[in-house]
């Protein structure tokens, strides 16, 4: 696994996302990585997250909206990482390559137990210059609890406030 999270490579001006922004202390602070040390091919991505009690749906189980949020942020972070890879650029170099969610589809497979570390695995389905499709599985205790598909599109210039 790489040592620096994808989200930690985002410019400060683009790091305020509730789900993954390093500058949002009230947020989830999700951190995504390449699953293996081989970052030269479109491999798998991985993230881990342990829900706090405030994300309870009913006692003992995680709120589904949290799972959707984690899938969303792991998907867009994975899209940014593969875009940098495809451009033969180091993550964090300017101009930024950031992606936003164009579509999110989540299927809940099994109840997600509270108190377990969640593992998110991202698999690339389609990679184009301005669009990346990532499938994400969320597991707890080695049981798949949710699956999601994120269609991520390159962030429009109108949203970028970064000066190169």
What are these language model-derived features?
Residues 77-119:
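Hydrophobic beta-strand-centered segment that forms part of the acyl-chain substrate-binding groove
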Residues 49-51, 108, 154:
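Hydrophobic residues in beta-strands and at strand termini
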Residues 1-58:
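Non-catalytic linker/capping segments at the edges of enzyme domains
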Residues 39, 60, 109-111:
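Exposed regions on extracellular, virion, or secretory-pathway luminal proteins
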Residues 1-12, 110-164:
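HotDog/MaoC-like acyl-thioester-processing domains
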Residues 41-42, 46-82:
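A conserved, well-ordered hydrophobic junction motif at loop->secondary-structure transitions
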Residues 27-29, 48, 101-105, 119-121, ...:
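Conserved beta-strand residues within beta-sheet cores
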């Amino acid at each position: 696994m790489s040592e620096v999270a994808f989200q930690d490579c985002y410019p400060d001006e683009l790091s305020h996302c509730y789900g993954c922004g390093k500058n949002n202390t009230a947020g989830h602070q999700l951190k995504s990585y390449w699953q293996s040390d081989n970052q030269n091919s479109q491999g798998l991505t991985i993230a881990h997250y342990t829900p706090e009690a405030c994300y309870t749906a009913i006692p003992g189980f995680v709120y589904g909206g949290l799972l959707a949020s984690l899938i969303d942020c792991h998907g867009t972070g994975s899209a940014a990482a593969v875009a940098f890879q495809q451009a033969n650029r180091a993550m964090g170099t300017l101009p930024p390559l950031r992606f936003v969610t164009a579509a999110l589809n989540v299927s809940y497979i099994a109840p997600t137990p509270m108190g377990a570390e969640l593992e998110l695995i991202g698999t690339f389905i389609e990679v184009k210059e301005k669009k990346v499709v990532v499938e994400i599985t969320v597991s707890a205790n080695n049981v798949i609890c949710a699956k999601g598909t994120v269609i991520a599109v390159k962030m429009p210039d109108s949203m970028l406030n970064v000066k190169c």
